[in-house]
Amino acid sequence: MQKVLERKIDAWAQALQKRNNLDRIAYLKIKLGLEVFFNNLFKTIVVYGLALLFHVFLYTLTVHLSYFAIRHYAHGAHAKSTFACYIESIILFVILPWILIKVDIPQIFMIVLAAVAFILICLYSPAITRKQPIPNHMRKKKKITAIFVAGILLIISFFIKQPFNELVQLGIVLIGAAQLPIFFPKQTKEG
C-alpha cells in the first residue's frame, strides 16, 4: 500500500512539474508536500478512528487542539520514522487521554505538570531542528506567541470542567516535553 501511494504521489508531482514547467527543486517540494499531506491524512484517520473505537474522540480532540495550538509556534521534537510517529500519536493522543479519564489523577498533579511544561516552553521554545530550521528573525515572535498561547490555555484550563481541564493541561504537558533538548542531540539552539 505504501509503495503504491509513493508511486502515485511521484506521478502526480511529475505531472505537475511537466504541466507547469517546474524545475527539479519545485518538483521535490511538491512531492514532499504531497507526502506530508497524505501521511498526516492517514495518521489522522488512524488516530481518530482509534479514538472513536475507544470512545475518547472528544478527549483526543481536546488534547490534540491544545497541543497543536502551541506546537504551531513552539515546534518541537519529531518521531524518527513514520511508523514511530504513528505509535507516538496513538500513545499520546488516544491512550494517554483514555488513561487520564479512567484513572483518578489528583488535579494538583496535572496542574504542577502543566506549570513545569509551561516553564519548559518559556525556556526552550521554539525548538529548532535540522529538518525544521527557524530563521533568526522569526524566533523571538514564535517564542512570545508560544508562551502567550500556552499561558492562555493554562488559564482557561482552570475555568473548564473536568476532565477537559486536565486534557488541555495534558496537551500543554506533551508539547512542553517536546521542547526538551534531550530530543535534539548534537544540535545547538542555532540549528
Swiss-Prot record:
A GO CC term assigned to this protein in UniProt: plasma membrane
UniProtKB keywords: Cell membrane, Hydrolase, Membrane, Protease, Quorum sensing, Transmembrane, Transmembrane helix, Virulence
Taxonomic superkingdom: Bacteria
Organism in which the protein naturally occurs: Staphylococcus carnosus (strain TM300)
Topology term for the membrane: Multi-pass membrane protein
Protein name stated in the entry: Accessory gene regulator protein B
Gene Ontology terms, MF aspect: peptidase activity
Keyword Transmembrane (UniProt): yes
Family under the similarity heading: Belongs to the AgrB family.
Main localization, broad class: membrane
